[in-house]
Amino acid sequence: MKRLVGGAALLVAVAIGGAYLNPYNIYDAAAEAGKSYVGSKACASCHEEEYENFIKYSKKAHSFHSVQLMRKELTSSELKECFHCHTTGYGKPGGFISEKQTPDLKNLGCETCHGPGSAHVDSEDASDILGKVDKDSCKACHNTDRVRAFRYKPMLYAGAH
């Protein structure tokens, strides 16, 4: 019995520790619940104005361009590290894999902040997607090591909200 309890405690500790070791692990729980990434174009049919503004005004919507500019100077592992903050869902079930395999996820999109959208697209139920996003959700990529001066509200509204 002690061995069983000890094993279970170790498993929980490893799972919790893994979440803290991977700061990009925000939406894994949602993906494990059967939700997958569908790409921002899937949002456009119901959220046309938000989508058009996002594509037109948000730098996030074109974030993969930065990766392409630096690609020649990066090792394979450095390039993959860029994918965490410059693509949608990289390293998560159904997320970005490569430009060829998942071209609709190669930039940051709606699901970067709102989580995997498949269930919401299918049901059109607001409870199937993360509606309100807070500043803490942004910290995995927008931190002092990466962004000199992160200003949440201007960035939020520049993201078409």
What is each stretch, according to the model?
Residues G6-N22:
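Hydrophobic membrane-insertion alpha-helices, especially the h-region
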Residues M1-L4:
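Positively charged n-region of N-terminal signal peptides that target proteins for export
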Residues G17-D134, F150-H161:
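Sequence context of c-type cytochrome heme-c attachment sites
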Residues K139, N143-D145:
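Domain-level detector of nuclease and nuclease-like folds
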